[in-house]
């Protein structure tokens, strides 16, 4: 879905959203990429998992739960209260496509696809603003 919001500023704001199914792969040879339909200024992706209490607590407890990119950054940032996990997810934007991969994560190999936001069989949702 792409929406061109007619705000009273020159050019307005663009919004798009969607979802994808994780494949279980990770690393530079297996990047994730999303065509958002316009040159984004902000991109946010999160695991579609409400948690056991239904409160979507991935912001504070789960480093594999979401990522944020804003114009001027070169990485998809982890948003997490867990200071023991460090993720490096290089991210680039080429035209309308946002791409990222996990280049390092201090976790067991079986967890790395999740840290790339590409866990097998998991649904991820995303939105972009431009």
Regions found by a protein language model. Give the residues of each.
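Enriched but not universal
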Residues: 1-21, 127-130
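Intrinsic-disorder/low-complexity loop/linker signature
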Residues: 6, 11-12, 18, 82, ...
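Generic structural motif
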Residues: 15, 43, 91, 124-126
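Surface-exposed ligand/attachment interfaces on beta-rich extracellular proteins
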Residues: 16-38, 48-63
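Short, structured motif recognition centered on aromatic/hydrophobic residues
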Residues: 38-45, 128
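Terminal beta-strand-rich extracellular "head" domains
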Residues: 62-91
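Noncatalytic modules at the cell exterior or secretory-pathway interfaces
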Residues: 95-114
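Short, structured beta-strand segments at or near domain termini in extracellular proteins/domains
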Residues: 110-130
């Amino acid at each position: 879905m792409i929406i061109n919001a007619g705000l009273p500023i020159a050019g307005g704001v663009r919004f798009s959203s969607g979802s994808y199914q994780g494949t279980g792969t990770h690393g530079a040879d297996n990047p994730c990429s999303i065509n958002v339909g316009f040159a984004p200024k902000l991109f946010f992706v999160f695991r579609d998992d409400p948690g056991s209490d239904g409160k979507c607590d991935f912001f504070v407890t789960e480093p594999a739960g979401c990522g944020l990119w804003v114009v001027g950054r070169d990485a998809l940032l982890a948003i997490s209260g867990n200071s023991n996990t460090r993720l490096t997810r290089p991210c680039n934007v080429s035209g309308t496509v946002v791409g990222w991969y996990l280049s390092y994560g201090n976790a067991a190999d079986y967890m790395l696809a999740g840290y790339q936001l590409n866990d097998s069989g998991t649904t991820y949702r995303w939105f972009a603003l431009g």
